[in-house]
Amino acid sequence: MKKQLILCLFLLSLLMISTFVTNADDNDNEIYEEEEDFTTNRDVKQRGLVRENVSAKQIINNYNKYFKNVDIKNFEQGNTLVYITPWNGKGYDVATKWAKKFTHISPVWHQVKFENNKVMIEGDHNIDKKWMEKVKENSDQKSKILPRFSFEGQQWGSKESFQKYIDPKLIDSLVSTVKKNNYDGLVIEGIVHINKQLRDPFLISLSEKLHSIGKEIILVIYPFRQKGQETGFGAKDFELLSNHIDGVSLMTYDFGPSGGMNAPKVWVEDNLKFLLPNGENKNSKKIFMGIPFYGYKIGENDQSDAIVGSEFISVLKQNKSKKLKFDQNTHEHIFTYKNKKNQQVSMTYPSLLFIEDRIQLANKYKVSISIWEIGQGLDYFMDLL
């Protein structure tokens, strides 16, 4: 009886060992440690998943499995800003679970509008105090919550309108909203294109008032699509304002969705060079280089449609035998398949290598990163951050 028991225990141990991860370099059917909570003992790099040669089956087998220590921060060169949208609840969950990886978290909550001859700050209904408390708790009070305030409407588009509506009262209202809700600051979008003679004093005054109460301000800026294109914000603007504000969020995505290009690596790098013509400087870290966690589907109905992680995985599951192609020019993975109407469709969606390539760019230029938006990605992306 004792020998039978020992034999049973030996066979059981062999069965457990057989579930361990094998090298993924040449094996699309990677065996992984399957646990109920989807955690693994090795991150995506250790599992050999950050590579050009990727199949649908490999992604399906691994996308929801992440390294068990969610507190380890792998991108340490700069800060990490992540956006969250109210209409995508997954982002809130990601922000709380991996809170220690994110230095700045920006929920898209507020709008600044002009109605009935007065400026209004809207969005209080989006505020989630319990979630804010959870983020603070999980990050040991280190993650900063800076909701986005988007200036919306045509009146912000002209010098005359901006001059009329921007006054100390608006600055006081913005500061009051930040203070009242115990935010760590704000991300401001929608004014970068305004006349600099009005924009810059406004931003400097706002930043001074926020800094006086220990709060931060980050400005959203747009990339150029072609060299020489006017963006409203260049190297001289960054040199001036970076001495006053806490950062600029550079939206290096949506380069050419209709052509299947979301954020070509060379284009992202060109935008960094545009802001840093002399290379890195003391304020380089204040540039939050944008990395998209969404992609595009091209070919259906002759248009391009944005896709998020769940949609990407759904398509892969219907086309398990296919492989992705890595474009050496854009450094993006492309997946091509035929839909139910027999139309050829192409998808470009971030891969692990796509993200790693852009993180290495951030390391090269000593800048920070920003992600739009965290809920649209796949869980194993977090291993790289």
Swiss-Prot record:
GO cellular component: endomembrane system; extracellular region
Residues of the GH18 domain: 78-385
Any one GO MF annotation of this record: chitin binding
Signal peptide region: 1-24
Localization of this protein: Secreted
Coiled coil residues, start to end: none
Keywords: Secreted, Signal
Major site of localization recorded for this protein: secreted
PROSITE patterns noted in UniProt: GH18_2 (PS51910)
Origin superkingdom: Eukaryota
Gene Ontology BP term (one): carbohydrate metabolic process
Family annotation (InterPro entries): Chitinase_II/V-like_cat, Chitinase_insertion_sf, Glyco_hydro18_cat, Glycoside_hydrolase_SF
Family statement drawn from the similarity comment of this UniProt entry: Belongs to the glycosyl hydrolase 18 family.
Family annotation (PANTHER family): CHITINASE DOMAIN-CONTAINING PROTEIN 1, CHITINASE DOMAIN-CONTAINING PROTEIN 1 FAMILY MEMBER
Protein name: Chitinase domain-containing protein 1
Species whose genome carries this gene: Dictyostelium discoideum (Social amoeba)
Organism ancestry: Eukaryota, Amoebozoa, Evosea, Eumycetozoa, Dictyostelia
